[in-house]
């Protein structure tokens, strides 16, 4: 939404229209945040529908709109290349833990770190409810995580991890392997613990359940014997 608004502000003679399709199960907090961003902008429409992805495919096929799909469009990687360069400014950075749904962030950071010839590990963290990439990684501790997960964890409190198709899976796995990183699966209790630890040890910082995945992954890695001789970063993302 912000990118479209910036484009339209800078290109008044070539304005773009954006339709945002969201599911009926979206949290009220997320929907209200999107609505606030788009409020009063006649070029942006937010529509709630039972099947947003199918509706987007239909609109693309009929020529009504172009479906901007982060999980398959490699243009989505470009913005994260800049994030990789920012992270590279951290002296002696050794690893990055990334809450992962489609894998776009992990793929982009991994590829850019390789280009920059930086020995920074990529660690992805997924949930007990959605883990198509982590469960495919041969060295992950995911089997233990799944066996000890409570039945309630079939639905994760980290609701942004939803991509069960994982079109980027092979490239993400390649990035993890090339960086000598890892893949982790966190249950709801581990996510809540990560939120509590962060709040208590980072100047009362309150992070979302989705952001807490990164911290939960780091905690699991440390418990499983991982060690580093430099700093480790956890990506704190949006809501």
Where do the model's predicted regions map?
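Short glycine/serine/threonine-rich phosphate/pyrophosphate-binding segments
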Residues: 1-3, 28-31, 77-78, 99-109, ...
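Transmitter module of two-component histidine kinases
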Residues: 3-22, 31-46
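Alpha-helix C-terminal capping segments
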Residues: 1-13, 111-116, 216-226
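Active-site/ligand-binding-proximal alpha/beta "capping" segment
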Residues: 60-116, 192-201
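Active-site/ligand-binding loops adjacent to catalytic centers
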Residues: 31-39, 46-64, 115-209
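A short, small-residue-rich loop immediately preceding and capping a beta-strand
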Residues: 1-3, 15-22, 94-105, 231-236
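Short internal beta-strands
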Residues: 18-25, 122-126
């Amino acid at each position: 939404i912000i990118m479209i608004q910036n484009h339209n502000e800078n290109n008044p003679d070539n304005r773009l229209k954006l339709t945002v399709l969201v599911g009926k199960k979206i949290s009220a907090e997320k929907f209200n945040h999107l609505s606030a961003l788009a409020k009063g902008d006649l070029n942006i429409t937010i529509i709630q529908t039972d099947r947003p992805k199918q509706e987007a495919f239909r609109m693309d096929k009929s020529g009504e709109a172009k479906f901007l799909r982060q999980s398959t469009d490699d243009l989505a990687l470009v913005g994260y290349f800049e994030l990789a360069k920012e992270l590279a400014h951290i002296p002696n950075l050794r690893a990055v833990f990334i809450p992962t749904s489609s894998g776009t962030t992990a793929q982009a950071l991994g590829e850019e770190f390789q280009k920059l010839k930086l020995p920074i590990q990529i660690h992805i963290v997924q949930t007990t409810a959605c883990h198509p990439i982590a469960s495919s990684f041969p060295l992950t501790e995911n089997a233990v995580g799944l066996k000890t997960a409570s039945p309630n964890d079939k639905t994760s409190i980290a609701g942004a991890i939803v991509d069960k198709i994982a079109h980027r899976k092979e490239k993400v796995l390649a990035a993890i392997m090339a960086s000598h990183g890892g893949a982790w699966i966190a249950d709801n209790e581990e996510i809540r613990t990560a939120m509590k630890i962060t709040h208590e040890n980072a100047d009362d910082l309150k992070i979302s359940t989705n952001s807490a995945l990164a911290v939960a992954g780091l905690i699991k890695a440390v418990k499983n014997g991982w060690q580093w001789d430099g700093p480790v970063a956890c990506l704190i993302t949006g809501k």
